Amino acid sequence: MQSLIGTGVALVTPFKKDFSVDIEALQRVVNFSIDGGVEYLVVMGTTAENATLTAEEKELVINTVIDVNKGRLPLVLGVGGNNTMQIVEELKTRDFSAFEAILSVSPYYNKPTQEGIYQHFKAIAEASPVPVILYNVPGRTASNMLPSTVIRLANDFDNVVAIKEAAGDMAQALKIIKDAPKDFLVISGDDMIALPIVLAGGAGVISVIGQGYPKEFSEMIRLGLNKKAVEAFKTQYFLSDCIDMIFEQGNPAGIKQVFQALGITENTVRLPLVSVDESLAERINDFVKNSIK
């Protein structure tokens, strides 16, 4: 899918200081990413703090992004969880007309076997009216979707079109790139190794830092896709300290501090997450201040 090549950003859900959803700030976040040149937007991913949003708030965020985007960029909707039947029901009842694809995380907490993971995504693929992006993030799910399972799904279902690979394991990403069907996309879910994955044949990234530095990060990925490694790595090295910092005390606390430093949103997150401490906030603020040209 050409629309999923390049940089997608996993949008935050901005909160006011009273922890209510800040719609005006969300509008600014969406426009900042679009104006910065990213290729697509991901709604209701992990970075959106969807686990601590009510059903009504989720719909508010989704509809706001659709309205602000106005069809300018492709949209991907996060539809995942550890209750397969519930996900299948959502896929059968929700209107997906505004979305290019869904992003579906491997089941967390239950710790399924590889066969369980396969059967979970088989049910999703058979129910989904739009293409499916698998999402492997073992640091959050406690179970790693192995390359053999990914490749099996890619071969068995035409609408399983990509994986967001966030195991942080280059060897694993390379095996999927090597063995998956020709048109299957390997999308990095790790900002720090996104460029190496792209240079190795990956299709791009679903990024966190990319919404704070959309122009720089998306251009870096485009350079990588065009095999202009030396030029691309200049941006990689420029942003590497900030990438480390935004994950130091958890996501999305770090990227929300970047947004606060940019004057786009508050840095508020909902419990059980907490905002970054004063020391890290100061370091992030200094980076942002010194990076503004």
Swiss-Prot record:
One of its GO terms (biological process) is lysine biosynthetic process via diaminopimelate. It is an enzyme of class 4 (lyase). The keyword Amino-acid biosynthesis applies. It is found in: Cytoplasm. The active site is at Y135 (proton donor/acceptor), K164 (schiff-base intermediate with substrate). Signal peptide: none annotated. Its EC number is 4.3.3.7. GO terms for cellular component: cytosol. It catalyses: L-aspartate 4-semialdehyde + pyruvate = (2S,4S)-4-hydroxy-2,3,4,5-tetrahydrodipicolinate + H2O + H(+). Belongs to the DapA family. NCBIfam families: dapA. Homotetramer; dimer of dimers. This is 4-hydroxy-tetrahydrodipicolinate synthase.
